[in-house]
Amino acid sequence: GIFSKFGRKKIKNLLISGLKNVGKEVGMDVVRTGIDIAGCKIKGEC
């Protein structure tokens, strides 16, 4: 009924927001790693 529809929507929203947060974290790690690699290549310290 109404509750199961609402429950599904809420679970879906939680999953989506969770995935977005994970994506941000992973994205930041990738960016940081990329900057580190670029920095050591510029300095010639890789």
Swiss-Prot record:
Main location: secreted
Compartments, as annotated in UniProt: Secreted
Pfam families named in the record: Antimicrobial_2
Disulfide bond positions: 40-46
Function: Antimicrobial peptide. Stimulates insulin release by BRIN-BD11 cells in vitro.
Similarity annotation: Belongs to the frog skin active peptide (FSAP) family. Esculentin subfamily.
Protein name stated in the entry: Esculentin-1
Protein species of origin: Pelophylax saharicus (Sahara frog)
